[in-house]
Amino acid sequence: MELITILNHCHRHRGFVYQHARFGPDKKSIEVDVRPREGSAAVCSGCHQPAPGYDHLPERCFEFIPLWGFLVFLLYRMRRVDCRNCGVVVEEVPWSDGKHQLTRAYMLFLARWARKLSWKETAEAFHTSWDKVCDAVEYVVGWGLEHRTLESIRAIGVDEIQYAKGHKYLTLVYQIDPGLTRLLWVGKERTLESFQGFFTVIGEQLAAQIEFVCSDMWQPYLNVIRQKCSQALHILDRFHIVAKMNKALDEVRAAESRKMAQDGHQPLLKKSRWCVLKRKENLTSQQKFRLRDLLRYNLQTVRAYLLKEDFQQFWEYNSPTWAGMFLDFWCYQTMRSRIEPMKKIARTLRAHRTLLLNYFKAKKQFSSGVVEGLNNKAKLTMRKAYGFRTFSITETALYHALAKLPEPNTAHRFY
């Protein structure tokens, strides 16, 4: 089967024909001549209407999908048209967009592989440059953002991840509906303005349709949600609550361990950090024996550990009423414990009591677990590339990997 036959089968365009195919001068590439079909009119690139021809430009080279390790190039002399609406402009061709050197099919091909491999690996695999892979991904992401639909967003989750040294963060907003999880928004820095930018994009009408919002306890997030999604049920992030409690327990353990060392007592808490921080089911056999020995002593660390473990019952309730009663009793006990880091946690939980109980009002359907999973995928995307140089490229890569954007149509799906 000849190459021209294959191209006519998988990449045929109305008004154009493939004329000749030959090896390039280096014998490592294939060049295919393209010409307009006889009697076909050129199309204006401005108004997309047929227009009479004006003249021809020098021959341009468009990169196509490689074939068996050979680079493939389409060679075509672009026509200029004399459009009555736009004047003399270059014609529109169906296989390329604007001044891109890559054909649309090749850009989509590279973008799909760039979702599976790092951009550098994609460039090396198909004998192209990193910049061209970047251009391909930017084209596909730009097209997808223009054509995506944002209707029927019922639940969102917001969180931040670090993307560069020096406390540089991204604000990420996800859709976390049961049937659809995707990235909706990437905001630069962890600020009130960056989160407000998401609501500017979706508009007041879509914001009014949001029923559930998951976030952590950072005050700017709480303020924006209260202002923009007052009708939504705001659910606090379980992951961050557990993390804060573990941090408080670790502070108690570290302070008590230092005091015991200063007073010359036996170092009972030495190498005990993960024994008290890990969940029981994740402990090793050695850590279980170590924990059992620790629980024999009347230490602040032991009392703080028991308070932390006791709080895990909170998440097992189904009724908001009973969960609220347990929370109140736990906070009462903790405030009488004389363990300041744990008392600080109790005060925080009391201040956000209503938002904590919203988890049960939502029937436990929404939590931060989905958000943390998507955050891990976002970090993996950046880690595969060992980081990106600019915020713009980072934003593009995250949309490409996580936003589930629609893709341009092509005459043939190669993979």
Per-range role (PLM):
Residues 41, 46, 52, 165-168, ...:
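Acidic/histidine-rich catalytic cores and adjacent linkers
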Residues 99-108, 120, 185-188, 211, ...:
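Acidic, glycine-enriched active-site microenvironments
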